[in-house]
Curated annotation (Swiss-Prot):
Protein name as catalogued: Octanoyltransferase
Gene encoding the protein: lipB
Predominant location category: cytoplasm
Organism in which the protein naturally occurs: Pseudarthrobacter chlorophenolicus (strain ATCC 700700 / DSM 12829 / CIP 107037 / JCM 12360 / KCTC 9906 / NCIMB 13794 / A6)
Annotated catalysed reactions: octanoyl-[ACP] + L-lysyl-[protein] = N(6)-octanoyl-L-lysyl-[protein] + holo-[ACP] + H(+)
Gene3D superfamilies tied to this protein: Bira Bifunctional Protein, Domain 2
The entry's keywords: Acyltransferase, Cytoplasm, Transferase
InterPro entries: aa-tRNA-synth_II/BPL/LPL, BPL_LPL_catalytic, Octanoyltransferase, Octanoyltransferase_CS
UniProt record, GO biological process: protein modification process
Subcellular location: Cytoplasm
Job of this protein: Catalyzes the transfer of endogenously produced octanoic acid from octanoyl-acyl-carrier-protein onto the lipoyl domains of lipoate-dependent enzymes. Lipoyl-ACP can also act as a substrate although octanoyl-ACP is likely to be the physiological substrate.
Residues reported in the UniProt entry to bind substrate: R72, G73, G74, K75, L76, T77, W78, H79, A144, I145, G146, G157, V158, A159
BPL/LPL catalytic domain mapped to chain residues: 34-214
Length: 222
């Protein structure tokens, strides 16, 4: 196998965002240089707001809470306990296949949620994974995606809402979306689902896409 998975910390060990960002950048440089294999980092963050490159001033926390600016795509979001974070640092087999990469990330998360009876899906024009409007509420986001590809190697990744508190989203315009809500796997099922509960299934589903996504150590990027 050319893909590895590394756990940086799950509850009760929450990972500081800056530390995870430093690990990402160091690992990214090694993968670009061929000094480390493509690796997916799995973790839970300590609570933090992060702002992607498209974030506008009016979307920032209403109470003035500090925000970490990052170089991923997308807008403002929150990370914290109860969210499974996955940062794939992958040498892409097809450098032009960014849309395919995003769709595969979505497919992994949709498959994991299906195990719990959650009908998660894509919604045209909206990033991430969603539960469509029903008797329980409007369209609601259950997982976010924000990535960057530099020198053919991916950074940043996905956040799956498992059991996290939704109150922090009330202080921001999450991902720039004003006409939809946010939810968690626990809220949709009525069960307590933690990041540690789904991490192994996430790995299993991700491995199904390894051959299509990841360049072998000996292979040149297309």
């Amino acid at each position: 196998m050319t893909l590895e998975f590394s756990g940086l910390g799950l509850a009760p060990e929450f990972v500081d965002y800056q530390h995870a960002w430093d690990v990402q950048r160091e690992l990214h440089g090694k993968v670009v240089a061929g000094e480390a294999p493509s690796t997916v980092l799995l973790l839970e963050h300590a609570a933090v707001y992060t702002a992607g490159k498209l974030t506008e001033d009016h979307e920032r926390p209403f109470d003035g809470t500090p925000v970490v600016a990052v170089d991923r795509g997308g807008k403002l979001t929150w990370h914290g306990p109860g969210q499974l974070i996955a940062y794939p640092i992958l040498k892409l087999k097809n450098r032009a296949g960014i849309r395919d990469y995003v769709e595969r990330l979505e497919a992994v998360m949709i498959a994991v949620m299906a195990d719990y009876g959650i009908r998660a899906e894509r919604i045209k024009g909206r990033a991430g994974v969603w539960v469509k409007a029903d008797a329980n509420g409007p369209d609601r986001k259950i997982a976010a995606i924000g990535i960057r590809v530099l020198n053919g190697v991916t950074m940043h990744g996905v956040a799956i809402n498992c059991s996290n508190d939704l109150a922090p989203y009330g202080q921001i315009i999450a991902c720039g979306i004003t006409d939809a809500g946010v939810t968690t796997m626990s809220r949709e099922t009525g069960k307590d689902i933690r990041p540690a509960d789904i991490a192994e299934r996430f790995v299993e589903e991700f491995r199904k896409h390894e051959e299509a996504l990841v360049s072998s150590p000996e292979g040149a990027l297309l």
